[in-house]
Swiss-Prot record:
<feature type="region of interest" description="Disordered">
    <location>
        <begin position="96"/>
        <end position="190"/>
    </location>
</feature>
<dbReference type="GO" id="GO:0080164">
    <property type="term" value="P:regulation of nitric oxide metabolic process"/>
</dbReference>
<keyword id="KW-0963">Cytoplasm</keyword>
<dbReference type="GO" id="GO:0034362">
    <property type="term" value="C:low-density lipoprotein particle"/>
</dbReference>
<dbReference type="GO" id="GO:0051117">
    <property type="term" value="F:ATPase binding"/>
</dbReference>
<dbReference type="Pfam" id="PF06936">
    <property type="entry name" value="Selenoprotein_S"/>
</dbReference>
<dbReference type="GO" id="GO:0019899">
    <property type="term" value="F:enzyme binding"/>
</dbReference>
<keyword id="KW-0832">Ubl conjugation</keyword>
<feature type="compositionally biased region" description="Basic and acidic residues">
    <location>
        <begin position="97"/>
        <end position="118"/>
    </location>
</feature>
<feature type="compositionally biased region" description="Gly residues">
    <location>
        <begin position="160"/>
        <end position="174"/>
    </location>
</feature>
<dbReference type="GO" id="GO:0032720">
    <property type="term" value="P:negative regulation of tumor necrosis factor production"/>
</dbReference>
<comment type="subunit">
    <text>Interacts with DERL1 and (via VIM motif) with VCP, suggesting that it forms a membrane complex with DERL1 that serves as a receptor for VCP. Also interacts with DERL2, DERL3 and SELENOK. The SELENOK-SELENOS complex interacts with VCP. Interacts with CCDC47.</text>
</comment>
<dbReference type="GO" id="GO:0051775">
    <property type="term" value="P:response to redox state"/>
</dbReference>
<keyword id="KW-1133">Transmembrane helix</keyword>
<feature type="transmembrane region" description="Helical">
    <location>
        <begin position="28"/>
        <end position="48"/>
    </location>
</feature>
<protein>
    <recommendedName>
        <fullName>Selenoprotein S</fullName>
    </recommendedName>
</protein>
<dbReference type="GO" id="GO:0009749">
    <property type="term" value="P:response to glucose"/>
</dbReference>
Amino acid sequence: MDRGEEPMSARPALETESLRFLHVTVGSLLASYGWYILFSCVLLYIVIQKLSLRLRALRQRQLDQAEAVLEPDVVVKRQEALAAARLRMQEDLNAQVEKHKEKQRQLEEEKRRQKIEMWDSMQEGRSYKRNSGRPQEEDGPGPSTSSVIPKGKSDKKPLRGGGYNPLTGEGGGTCSWRPGRRGPSSGGUS
């Protein structure tokens, strides 16, 4: 029975030794390159996901093309829908062009009318520039526009009084400004 016990006890010792060796090897490998292994696994997972999505899309496209070849009615319906959409878009564009042309026509008519009014007012001797807020008076009881002398700026109050200019030192005040001298600030021989 001693012989029967020896192989049994020797075998677990070999297994524990190999497990210990495996544990030490894997532990040192993870300690040295653990983050690299983790990031490469995550990157590999992301790449596999992206490729699987693209493969699914490619398969779906191939199936759609195969169905389109098998069903010509679907192709005809798609082409008709596309033509109808193009026609609607063209009609919308044509309507926008017509609106724009009408607006341009109205603007040209307004400009032409203003030029005619300006020409007429110049022929009558009036100023052709009208104030938009006040219409001009026609032959009013007051004096004619050619004999009235404009008042100028006498009605307006000056923004600054007294003619004081701080840059020149003119006009009231006890302090006057003079520009500084050029050259070094301290006196010395050069």
